């Protein structure tokens, strides 16, 4: 049976609280009786020096606690199967991520038999999960799924929250319902469609994939683009079942961007929600201070305890290839360097220097070049061995 990372909540919380209680801020913390997330934010804000392993365990536990919600049966359903060219097949499926949230997906894979075991009913293959960006959908990743299936993988894509079939307006809605949902989160504090909920959906997707007899659960990798890249590194930091991760044009430091007046491009992806939230709050000409308020409501900790430099080290020692554009305003280079420094330190400590690579595309903005797509595929093939 796979290890349930959510079971680590109590032990990790105990480790962090005990360490803080023995430190110079112990009396204040004991009086405040801070919950786990607040303790992790306090550590981050005050720059308290804890052993890396304890900090990482506490950060993961706090993030999992933030994501956690009542468990429901997967209630997985397999829909239509379509034969594709080159002995590939496409399978529609869905599963329950939580109450009221069914996640539709598609699988593209080679036909079950193989030259090495032609009589086998099923061949367990490695998986590549593909996560789309803002305004995208699972069907938009079909060509990439086919490419990975040709290489011997089971390619899987799902619709993110309020995207594709999960938007009332369907594909035509693009990102409008997603942006409106983020505004509703700001107003009500319910749901976290800005990255966090889809990270949870990915973890539940892995729960589903583990039930399939054509999947090798020890070899599950993922690639994500922009919003999907952020969701991927968050999910990989939280869930060690993601064996290999390739976040593309997503790795960043939200905090650095906010502190250095470089937040506009990232906020621009949800501009309508941000503007309406500022209007609700009576804020004209919103700046960095309101950006922090906005993030705290729609994705608590994304610019603090769960920022890129805090989350990437949690992926070590699993193979991690981050692909970014040198002049991408959504992932400013100085903040990206902070993420890379934190990751390199963690991978070095783990004795896995060769398992972290930052690929910076020269003179490139918010896109992934063809040569980087080749590099991503080679990375997944290298470590997942289809």
Residue spans for each PLM region:
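N-terminal cap/lid segment of alpha/beta-hydrolase-fold proteins
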Residues: 69-113
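Bacterial N-terminal signal peptides
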Residues: 35-49
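Short beta-strand/loop motif that positions the catalytic acidic residue
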Residues: 322-324
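Mobile cap/lid helix-loop segments that gate and shape the active-site cleft of serine hydrolases
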Residues: 244-311, 332, 336-341, 346-353
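Cap/lid segment of the alpha/beta-hydrolase catalytic domain
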Residues: 123-124, 129, 133-200, 254-261
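Acidic catalytic loop of the alpha/beta-hydrolase fold
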Residues: 327-331, 365-367
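C-terminal catalytic histidine-bearing segment of alpha/beta-hydrolase fold enzymes
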Residues: 277, 286, 340-386
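Primarily recognizes the serine-hydrolase "nucleophile elbow" in alpha/beta-hydrolase
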Residues: 203-269, 300-303
